[in-house]
Amino acid sequence: MKHTTIFRSILPLCIAGTALFFAACEDNEETEEIGSLLFESKNVTLALDETVQLRVRLYRPGSTENTWYDTTANPYNLQWSSGDPSIASVDAQGRLTGHAIGSTVIRCAMSDNSVHATTRVTVHDGTGESLAAELSRPFDDALVYSRSVYLQRNTIMQSFDIETDGTLWYLQLGGNDPELLYVLRGAPNESPKDYMMLRWFGHGTNFAVEEQGAERYIWIGSNGNKLSDGSYSQSNTVSRLKYSPDKNRKLDLCGGDTFFIKDKWNVHPAIDTDNDILCITASTTGVRDFIFYRLSDALATPLSKVTLRTQTYGGEDADSPQKTETRTIEAHDLTSIAPLGSFTISVPGKDNLSQYDFQGFDVQDGLLYFYEGEAAGKQPKSIAFVTVLDISGNIVVPRTQVGAINDVNALVEAGICSSDSNGYIEAEGIKMKHDRLYIGFATHGPGAKRWANVFRY
């Protein structure tokens, strides 16, 4: 699927710097006082190799003039600069060009630096109109990457990932053992052959698999909290742990490298190893945060003692009595390093973003893929949406309804769900891999069997 740019978000005017400036003049001219310099937007998004014209205004005290500055003539000799020209460069007339995936700051200033302004620029890979059109299309059997896979327990998958060679990974709830999460690995269209069990980690809404030679590392929310119904959620930390399949051993609470962000919980990770990006989402009532870090910076952060929120866990068997405690552990404290960017959305947010249940996210090439939806039962019919944003939260591809799950009869005929399931198909997991978008769905087969399905766009 070839990606093309659809639009660039422009936000309201913002003041980025103020000062007083007396313009250069001939001997017989009055000096002219400049009060402030303003960019058109505090955030600009553009695609690789795209060139756009940046616009600014100069404001004079007491003046009502409200026109764009003539960047071509440049009568005040404004100076333009980029914090990282390898990501985005800007010429003497304010023309901006994207060169590499990432984010940097563009500065515009008077020649003596007495007045200046900045705007943050994000360069992405150009995903746009073609993706929205693909997602809107009706069901076609060619969309199915893997269908009707029964996992280890008769519960729905929560998320999935895909290796470079096409191997599928799943994260599944423990069913009658609500303290467990299963991490499973298998070929498309086949039940997984091996798995490992995680105990008291959380709900597993999102996870990621990191490939390192022959080894695989799982990024997942950890140090979960037991809710009143016995289920687990509200992960306090994110862990990166080596995949070690063992059907007789459980890993408790966390493992491997564990990462902490002060005052953030309900945390889930996504990674883009090619571009050295770690993104962590955290949620509280009414809001969801997305925070971006250099993956290498996160791994290099030294271990320190951190105190978690009070958590309850255990009590599922006689050997593990229930505990409620405030624990101090050693972790990589990401609060100590500067993020690359972040944004927060309300629930529901702009353009109805996050109107439905959050079903996962992924990051790739400077973009964040946001997945939401609900199954038939909560809604008259199953529904799912994908929205693509940049690392500043600007919408790059508008919220698009997934058309492939609208025709229940077609899904039944294709063996995705059964005729006695009332059209149950629930969005579960999203990944952008190898220039293709993969979205997951949990369905019910005959006899209420739970199936995992993955579509590819």
Q: What kind of region is each of these model predictions?
A:
Residues 184-225, 418-421:
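Blade-loop segments of beta-propeller domains
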Residues 180-189, 232-246, 288-301, 305-311, ...:
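Beta-propeller blade signature
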Residues 153-165, 203-216, 263-279, 354-364, ...:
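Structural signature of eukaryotic scaffold interfaces centered on beta-propeller domains
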Residues 136-150, 194-200, 245-265, 304-354, ...:
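Surface-exposed loop and turn segments in beta-propeller and other repeat-based domains
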Residues 349-403:
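Loop/turn-rich, solvent-exposed surfaces of beta-rich toroidal or solenoidal domains
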Residues 146-179:
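Beta-strand-rich domains and repeat architectures in extracellular enzymes and scaffolds
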Residues 21-24:
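C-terminal motif of bacterial Sec signal peptides marking the signal peptidase cleavage site
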Residues 26-128, 207:
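Extracytoplasmic soluble-region selector
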